[in-house]
């Protein structure tokens, strides 16, 4: 009975359409400040692998296109360069709402969450040979989902590269406005050999994505 009462209160808040109340009940703060001694810089990138056909589309002329993000130890700290957690928030919030099954106004305050990453901040001097971590998100994930960990590593002198595996990510948005939607969900009704016949090519595509990024 107590759970039903709590649920009724939550539903009442949802029904009110009051985003301010929702942000209080379901708070989302700025990302925690990383513990390392260095500031954190970030850059976005887009690459096209001209040697690979895009396996998720039917047009044989489509080449594999990737969007990603890099975090690295920066030489300066400037709060005016801090990036929001969500790029293209208006488009991403629609998809987050759809995937989570929550009304859009319940997730709208995600667009106000700030990271500690400074866009195009200069690289920390003498950091060209620091360790590198390559991050690969899960099915329907996104390149920046583990920004907290990426910033933590970068603040300790480690460079992190993450890529949206196009069509495996929940939504990839390119700088020209085109998108790659999620197309990897057709595994639920497959078992045994049928499952792996469908999934293995996708996994090979992911591995090829990472190899391509490292080569770049």
Segments predicted by a language model, with ranges:
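C-terminal motif of bacterial Sec signal peptides marking the signal peptidase cleavage site
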Residues: 16-17
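Domain-level recognition of soluble alpha/beta enzyme cores
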Residues: 21-133
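Short aromatic-enriched loop/helix-cap "lid" or pocket-rim segments at secondary-structure transitions
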Residues: 81-83, 172-176
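Short substrate-entry loop that stabilizes the transition state in hydrolases
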Residues: 116, 122-130, 135, 139-173
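Alpha/beta-hydrolase active-site loop
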Residues: 178-216
């Amino acid at each position: 009975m107590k759970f039903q009462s709590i649920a009724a209160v939550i539903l009442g808040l949802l029904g009110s359409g009051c985003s301010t109340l929702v942000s209080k009940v379901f708070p989302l703060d700025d990302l925690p400040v990383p513990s390392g001694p260095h500031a954190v810089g970030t850059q976005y990138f887009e690459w096209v692998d001209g040697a690979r056909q895009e396996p998720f589309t039917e047009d044989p002329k489509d080449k594999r296109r990737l969007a990603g993000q890099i975090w690295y130890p920066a030489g300066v700290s400037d709060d005016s360069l801090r990036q929001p957690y969500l790029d293209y928030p208006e488009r991403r919030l629609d998809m987050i709402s759809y995937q989570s099954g929550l009304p859009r106004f319940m997730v709208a305050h995600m667009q106000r969450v700030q990271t500690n990453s400074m866009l195009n901040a200069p690289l920390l001097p003498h950091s060209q040979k620091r360790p590198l971590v390559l991050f690969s998100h899960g099915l329907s994930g996104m390149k920046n989902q583990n920004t907290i960990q990426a910033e933590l590593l970068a603040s300790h002198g480690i460079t992190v590269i993450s890529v949206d595996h196009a069509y495996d990510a929940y939504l990839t948005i390119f700088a020209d406005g085109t998108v790659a939607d999620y197309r990897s969900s057709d595994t639920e009704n497959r078992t045994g050999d049928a499952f792996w016949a469908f999934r293995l090519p996708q996994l090979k595509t992911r591995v090829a994505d990472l190899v391509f990024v490292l080569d770049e």
